[in-house]
Amino acid sequence: MATGTPAAELRELTEEELVSRLRESKEELFNLRFQMATGQLDNNRRLRVVRHEIARIYTVMRERELGLATGPAGKGDAA
């Protein structure tokens, strides 16, 4: 899969799911960099896609922190 997750899809996730996605993406980026260093990386574009996905996750988290966007509908609005 050479495409990242759209921001709209990330905005539907809860905070815990975003943190989990972030951890997974960072792990993948680490592994891709390791493969690149050892000359085993076949798809260089995947590095860029994963970096952009990490940036999207951070952006969604920051939007919520600043109050520019809310979490998924129905979660936390009732309290």
Swiss-Prot record:
GO terms for biological process: translation. Keywords: Ribonucleoprotein, Ribosomal protein. GO terms for cellular component: cytosolic large ribosomal subunit. InterPro entries: Ribosomal_protein_uL29, Ribosomal_uL29, Ribosomal_uL29_CS, Ribosomal_uL29_sf. GO terms for molecular function: structural constituent of ribosome. Gene3D superfamilies: 1.10.287.310. Belongs to the universal ribosomal protein uL29 family. PANTHER family: 60S RIBOSOMAL PROTEIN L35/50S RIBOSOMAL PROTEIN L29, LARGE RIBOSOMAL SUBUNIT PROTEIN UL29C. This is Large ribosomal subunit protein uL29. It comes from Nocardia farcinica (strain IFM 10152). The gene is rpmC.
